[in-house]
């Protein structure tokens, strides 16, 4: 009997990001909360100080909650500017989640106390902005400014889900953060839909008998 060789998935190496030349103030922008059935989509914009680096920045999803919470005050203290933008469930239902995310990113950039020369956006598309912008695929892993933005947005949204959990403990929002899990589906089936649910999302529409 011939033993089969184990196949391991090759790790895809991301190319290092080359920052465009000629820009003084660069903002990184990221979002959290496109997939959940409940709550705001939250974005953050961050301009880091190149003379005051922050160790350990990475995509917020790759960091433990403890590490994110430890990095948050350091990011806020050392950044030249940071701001949070959001769109509510009502706006998401009106615009659709993609457009609402773009609007939330615009709000985060507008909220910066210093306006950047360039905005680096995580993903493959940019919102309309008054300054130059560039989409960076996997930017939360490749660009420190985007990593910092992802950490702020993630912590802010998670904390909002924990607050919502206090109002509606039967839904378990602190655990699944509003994402479409089995426990969330069962809670909707048992307790119905709350005002913070996104009514345009298929499982919620179905629960409301609109699908």
UniProtKB/Swiss-Prot annotation:
Named from the GO MF annotations, one term is:
manganese ion binding
Could you confirm whether the keyword Lipid biosynthesis appears in this record? no
Membrane-crossing ranges are none
Enzyme nomenclature, EC number: 3.1.26.4
One GO cellular component from the entry? ribonuclease H2 complex
Q: Top enzyme class of this protein? A: hydrolase
Chief location category? cytoplasm
User: Which reaction does this enzyme catalyse, per its entry?
Assistant: Endonucleolytic cleavage to 5'-phosphomonoester
- Where, per UniProt, does this protein localize? Cytoplasm
The alphabetical list of record keywords is: Cytoplasm, Endonuclease, Hydrolase, Manganese, Metal-binding, Nuclease
Cofactor binding note from Swiss-Prot or TrEMBL = Manganese or magnesium. Binds 1 divalent metal ion per monomer in the absence of substrate. May bind a second metal ion after substrate binding.
Sequence positions that bind a divalent metal cation: 30-31, 122
Every RNase H type-2 domain range: 24-211
List, separated by semicolons, the cofactors it needs.
Mn(2+); Mg(2+)
The record's Gene3D superfamilies line, in alphabetical order, gives: Ribonuclease H-like superfamily/Ribonuclease H (3.30.420.10)
Q: List the disulfide bonds.
A: none
UniProt family annotation: Belongs to the RNase HII family.
Under the heading NCBIfam families, the entry gives: PRK00015.1-1, PRK00015.1-3, PRK00015.1-4
Function text? Endonuclease that specifically degrades the RNA of RNA-DNA hybrids.
Q: Which PANTHER family match?
A: RIBONUCLEASE H2 SUBUNIT A, RIBONUCLEASE HII
Instruction: Write the protein's name.
Output: Ribonuclease HII
Question: Could you tell me which species this protein originates from?
Answer: Vibrio parahaemolyticus serotype O3:K6 (strain RIMD 2210633)
